[in-house]
A protein has these predicted regions:
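Short, charged, low-complexity amphipathic alpha-helix
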Residues: 2-39
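Amphipathic, interaction-prone secondary-structure segments
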Residues: 60-91
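Short histidine-centered catalytic/ligand-binding loop motif
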Residues: 28-36, 104-115
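Well-ordered alpha/beta subsegment
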Residues: 111-136
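Intrinsically disordered, low-complexity regulatory segments enriched in Ser/Thr/Pro
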Residues: 86, 90-113
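Generic structural hydrophobic/aromatic packing signal, biased to beta-strands
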Residues: 43, 47-50, 94-96, 122, ...
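Generic, well-ordered alpha-helical segments
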Residues: 42, 74-76, 88, 114, ...
Length: 136
């Protein structure tokens, strides 16, 4: 797994985020992940700041997490959306698909993130802060 270095610490509330979107700078508790995953039964949407190593997880749309991270000082260019599927194991738990990933100016012309290096960074941050596909 890629070395994550020092994670950014967030002190106090960042914005008026919906209660079903959580900003992570450390590993999420399994009970909290279970609560967030209830919306879609077996999946939770999340957005990763690949530079600050933060995750905004939960919500109905990726844009909810994107906005929370922007409010916390993230840069748009560093934010990428994905879906986490608990119980699918390490190789199948991350789906690198989101409307916020459509960025022709960054070389990504579809909802699916295609850059292998970015995918690996997201994978490492996901495994550190969210999980590795373990069942809830």
């Amino acid at each position: 797994m890629t070395d994550l270095g020092e994670a950014t610490t967030i002190d106090g509330p960042v914005s008026d985020a919906p209660p079903d979107v959580v900003l992570l700078d450390r590993r999420i508790e399994p009970a909290e992940l279970r609560r967030l995953a209830e919306r879609f039964e077996d999946m939770v949407k999340y957005v990763v700041d690949v530079e600050r190593r933060l995750v905004a997880i939960g919500g109905e749309m990726h844009v909810d997490g994107e906005q929370l991270l922007l409010d916390a000082g993230s840069r748009q260019a560093d934010l990428w959306g994905a879906n986490y599927h608990p119980g699918r194991g390490r190789e199948a738990c991350i789906e690198y698909t989101s409307f916020i990933n459509i960025r022709p100016s960054a070389g990504n012309r579809s909802m699916e993130l295609t850059d292998p290096a970015l995918r690996e960074r997201i994978r490492a941050i996901t495994f550190a802060l969210v999980g590795e596909g373990e069942p809830l």
